[in-house]
Amino acid sequence: MTHDNIDILVVDDDISHCTILQALLRGWGYNVALANSGRQALEQVRERVFDLVLCDVRMAEMDGIATLKEIKALNPAIPVLIMTAYSSVETAVEALKTGALDYLIKPLDFDNLQATLEKALAHTHIIDAETPAVTASQFGMVGKSPAMQHLLSEIALVAPSEATVLIHGDSGTGKELVARAIHASSARSEKPLVTLNCAALNESLLESELFGHEKGAFTGADKRREGRFVEADGGTLFLDEIGDISPMMLVRLLRAIQEREVQRVGSNQTISVDVRLIAATHRDLAAEVNAGRFRQDLYYRLNVVAIEVPSLRQRREDIPLLAGHFLQRFAERNRKAVKGFTPQAMDLLIHYDWPGNIRELENAVERAVVLLTGEYISERELPLAIASTPIPLAQSLDIQPLVEVEKEVILAALEKTGGNKTEAARQLGITRKTLLAKLSR
């Protein structure tokens, strides 16, 4: 089973234990989120979809059993594994009765943990397989964010209809994938999906590509050619970057859409076509109409149903999934045993603004895999623009108690000094006694 699209939430008020588990699970290829209390865990479960929760029993304020009950109330399908340092039968039985899938004894045996995780996830996979559902990954789209779920819902609603669809989104967001998903989910799925990038061709070539031409219609036309409209007959025609078409071509395109018929270049014969049209653009066509650069009548013909594809900045929570997806692909292609990303590298990917969106992320991961000499991609393998991304000190709006922040800083100092408490205290500007006291809180 591949792990690049699996999200695990670790819930434990022991920050050092959380950090160790995070590093371990990321090393196994999982995406990991942390919660240092039951309340934090519930907030995250409300905001995101997790494949599995790993929760400690003994926590202050809200214990693991209470957290388990609340998680199951929010989402009964999430498998929860309980961790306990107390191997009492009563605790295990109570956890299982409350809805836990299994329990683990602390200190954790890592081999047992890995086996239990795979068993729990395999159990979930079997349950999901028995309930067929349309998912983004079926169409090459990866993500679990609210923005992606909204996009999938729109695709599911639009696909069964015959309505013309206008897809808008920045370059590199995956507009063609949306078009393919609509076609694959429609009644026309057994017929052709024909695609054409309108921005890549000049006016004369675009006319020939769309409508076809007769032999001898122009220099180099040594044989008759059917156009994309005819090739897509019975199926779907996807016109990418339609906002780049010239005014003259817009007139011909409008006529073809209205009359549902085309003429090859150099011919007077009309050919009836049955085509569903999906168009895409990165331009604001309403503004183009107001500026006189795009025909209003064609805009209304195209804009029957509008779908907005979110930029990568609008779905940052999907970046670990996408990065893992591309990592697996390029590791296999380049025959490299890459285990994952370092936490620092993943933080950089998440906080970078991605002007080129998914296409830029894909290129960055491919480059990193090619340059990698070790097992984990670090900031050294990332392009300079990404590696120099500033990471905000506060990465969420949640304000942690000061004692937790202090402990995190101390743990970081200890890691930097190789566990030397005296040196860590010196670098932090406190006494060794104060450091030990703060660690024991």
Curated annotation (Swiss-Prot):
Which positions fall inside the Response regulatory domain?
A: 7-121
- How is the activity of this chain controlled? Activity of the ZraS/ZraR two-component system is repressed by the zinc-bound form of ZraP, which probably interacts with the periplasmic region of ZraS.
Q: Which domain of life is it from?
A: Bacteria
Example of a GO biological process term: phosphorelay signal transduction system
Keyword Metal-binding found: no
UniProt-annotated location(s): Cytoplasm
Sorted alphabetically, which keywords does the UniProt record give? Activator, ATP-binding, Cytoplasm, DNA-binding, Nucleotide-binding, Phosphoprotein, Stress response, Transcription, Transcription regulation, Two-component regulatory system
Per UniProt, residues of the Sigma-54 factor interaction domain are 141-370
Question: Where is ATP bound in this sequence?
Answer: G172, T173, R329, R359
Q: Which residues carry this modification: 4-aspartylphosphate?
A: D56
Q: Which NCBIfam families match?
A: PRK10365.1
Protein name (record): Transcriptional regulatory protein ZraR
Q: Source taxonomy lineage?
A: Bacteria, Pseudomonadati, Pseudomonadota, Gammaproteobacteria, Enterobacterales
